[in-house]
């Protein structure tokens, strides 16, 4: 990133593409590939066309926080935990990219509080952040949250079909990932853009439960991330606050783990419907899903 900041304006797009190139394999299914500079923008990456002192300060904060080494150490710790339990899942070699976010993007800064990350494709993790004190404090937890997703959807784990996958799978996946992060890093593991009010709200939980059987990942945004994200990406709001799916997923997964005497690490490949069938009645809810 520092090279991009120092480069002439006409050189920056190519450098952004170079920065993202190790992640190009995420888009192997797209005929002809994708423009990785566009992926940078879609992931709330900093605006290389309008560099400001604030962006330079953001990069410096990440450097001062030893962000890259901390994330690497956290991922190594997490991988070692999974390898020790011999889960039967192939733990992939990881390509990981930490990128500074765009401080002028109101949704990124206010709604999701400086964090956009993705680890759902085996072997690849992207983390876009704005280095607030809260984000910097959570770097390790953010990384292992994405690692849990990555291992869940690696060979030998859960098969993700974007056309048939359910909201329930995504909700449970987020709950498992947050619980895994808390197993390693305590309360820092909980995704910080989910408010305590949302986490403890029974009406939010009931509302999310009503959408669990919806299929197709194109329909997930409102149910998992909430109405604000749905509106941003052109999806239909359903009446849920930001992070509703995370909040519901955490409650459901916690109930399941307590009943099963298991951990999020041990349950990395547990089917979502199995978790929901056990957890829902414990929370006074009904789940009618099918395998």
Where are the predicted features?
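Conserved mixed alpha/beta catalytic, RNA-binding, or beta-rich assembly cores of soluble enzyme
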Residues: 123-125
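Short pre-active-site segment immediately N-terminal to the catalytic Zn-binding motif
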Residues: 128-143
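Pan-zinc metallopeptidase signature
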Residues: 209-291
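N-terminal low-structure segments adjacent to metalloprotease catalytic domains
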Residues: 1-66
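Active-site recognition of the HExxH zinc-binding catalytic motif
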Residues: 141-157, 174, 178
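Post-HExxH zinc-binding segment in Zn-dependent metallohydrolases
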Residues: 163-207, 211, 283-288
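Auxiliary, metal-adjacent structural segments of Zn-dependent hydrolase domains
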Residues: 58-121, 136
């Amino acid at each position: 990133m520092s090279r991009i900041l120092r480069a002439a304006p006409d050189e920056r797009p190519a450098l952004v593409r170079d920065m993202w190139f190790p992640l190009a394999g995420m888009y192997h299914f797209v005929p002809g590939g994708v423009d990785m500079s566009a992926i940078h923008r879609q992931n709330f990456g900093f605006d290389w066309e309008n560099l400001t002192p604030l962006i330079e300060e953001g990069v410096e904060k990440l450097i001062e926080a030893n962000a890259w080494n901390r994330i690497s150490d956290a991922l190594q710790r997490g991988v070692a935990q999974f390898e020790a339990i011999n889960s039967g899942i192939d733990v992939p070699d990881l390509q990981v990219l930490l990128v500074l976010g765009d401080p002028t993007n109101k949704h990124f800064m206010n709604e999701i509080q400086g964090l956009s990350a993705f680890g759902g494709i085996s072997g690849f993790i992207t983390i876009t952040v704005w280095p607030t004190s809260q984000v910097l404090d959570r770097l390790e937890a953010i990384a292992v949250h994405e690692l849990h997703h990555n291992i869940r959807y690696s060979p030998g784990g859960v098969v993700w079909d974007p056309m048939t996958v359910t909201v329930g799978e995504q909700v449970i996946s987020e709950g498992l990932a947050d619980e895994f992060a808390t197993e390693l890093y305590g309360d820092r593991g909980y995704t910080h853009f989910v408010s305590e009010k949302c986490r403890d709200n029974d009406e939010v939980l009931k509302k999310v439960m009503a959408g669990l059987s919806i299929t197709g990942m194109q329909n997930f945004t409102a149910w998992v991330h909430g109405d604000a994200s749905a509106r941003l990406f052109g999806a239909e709001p359903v009446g849920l606050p930001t992070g509703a799916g995370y909040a519901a997923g955490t409650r459901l997964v916690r109930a399941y783990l307590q009943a099963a005497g298991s951990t999020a690490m041990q349950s990395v490949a547990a089917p979502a419907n199995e978790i929901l069938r056990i957890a829902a009645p414990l929370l006074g809810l009904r789940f009618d899903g099918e395998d």
